[in-house]
Structures are given as structure tokens and as C-alpha cells.
């Protein structure tokens, strides 16, 4: 649940949302000075925080140090700017591993199945994607052909 506004407004809205929805709520703040300040306050209060609009490893380190539960590097938007979004995910994941940081990497702005798989391969624990991309994860031509063979075999058994 994303919060916007001044640091004070974001903090109070985050607390309000947590009071209303409990621990199922994760409060989403931007990776700005104000957002990271709010992240620290909310995480100190025991509230899960996702720091979003991450575009480099240094931002992800600052977010983790502020107590972020999740960080969201925007792979698709980085790729749009000719920056290797998956390399940013890999760098963040590797830094977290080396330093024992428990913040989870959530690859955002995923626009293809291949980008999702490569995100997971590069250390992301979670990927967000449009429903169309998620649905494509089920599809494979060999599965379709296999189902056709199974169906024909089944019809042969029933005769």
C-alpha cells in the first residue's frame, strides 16, 4: 500500500494502514530521503516496508540499512534507459548476500517471462508483472503437444 506526501504524512498514513489491515499490509515508500526516513520509523515500529523506485545498488543498500523488508528495483524502466536492469538486481542480491542483509529483492516492472526468470536467476525473491506475463509462464509448446499425445492415448484406451 503506497503512501505519498511529506515524511510526516507518509508515516501517519503508513501507521493508519497498518492499524486497519494489520501485518498483511506492507507499506510502500519511495527511495527518497523522506521515504527512507519513513522506512526507518515504520520498520522500528515493526511494520513491513517496501522501498520502491530503486534504480541502483547504492539506493538498495540505503533502503536495507533503513530497515526495508523489500526493495523494488525497476528492471523494465532501467532497460528502457539502456541500463542493464538485471545486472542491478544481481548487484543488489550479491551485496545483500555478502553482508548478510535480509531485505528481499522484488524485481518490478517485469515485462516478459524471460525477464522474470532472469530476475530470479540473478537473486530476486519476488517478481511483479502484468497478468499477461504471468499467464505466459504456464505456456509451452511442448506441454501443448504432450497434452495432445496424452489425449490421443486416452482415447485409444477407451476404445
Locate predicted features.
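Active-site beta->alpha loop and helix N-cap motifs at the rims of alpha/beta catalytic domains
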Residues: 1-45, 75
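Hydrophobic faces of well-ordered beta-strands that scaffold small-molecule active sites
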Residues: 1-3, 25-29, 47-52, 71-73, ...
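Active-site beta-loop-alpha junctions enriched in small/polar residues
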Residues: 2-6, 30-34, 54-56, 76, ...
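Catalytic cores of alpha/beta
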Residues: 9, 13-14, 38, 56-66, ...
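Alpha-helix-loop-beta-strand connector modules within alpha/beta enzyme cores
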Residues: 19-21, 36-49, 84-105, 147-159
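A contiguous pocket-lining binding segment that forms or flanks enzyme active sites
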Residues: 52-106
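Glycine-rich phosphate-binding active-site loops on the catalytic face of alpha/beta enzymes
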Residues: 53, 67-81, 122-143
Amino acid at each position: 500500500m503506497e503512501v505519498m506526501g511529506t515524511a510526516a504524512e507518509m508515516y501517519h498514513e503508513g501507521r493508519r494502514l497498518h492499524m486497519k489491515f494489520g501485518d498483511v499490509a506492507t507499506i510502500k515508500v519511495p527511495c527518497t530521503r523522506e521515504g527512507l526516513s519513513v522506512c526507518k520509523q515504520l520498520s522500528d515500529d515493526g511494520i513491513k516496508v517496501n522501498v520502491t523506485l530503486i534504480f541502483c545498488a547504492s539506493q538498495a543498500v540505503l533502503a536495507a540499512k533503513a530497515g526495508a523488508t523489500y526493495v523494488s528495483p525497476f528492471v523494465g524502466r532501467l532497460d528502457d534507459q539502456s541500463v542493464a536492469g538485471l545486472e542491478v538486481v544481481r548487484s543488489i542480491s550479491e551485496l545483500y548476500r555478502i553482508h548478510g542483509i535480509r531485505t528481499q529483492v522484488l524485481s518490478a516492472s517485469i515485462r516478459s517471462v524471460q525477464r522474470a526468470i532472469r530476475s530470479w536467476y540473478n537473486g530476486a525473491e519476488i517478481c511483479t508483472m502484468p497478468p499477461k506475463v504471468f499467464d505466459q509462464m504456464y505456456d509451452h509448446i511442448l506441454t501443448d503437444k504432450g497434452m495432445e499425445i496424452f489425449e490421443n492415448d486416452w482415447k485409444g484406451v477407451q476404445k
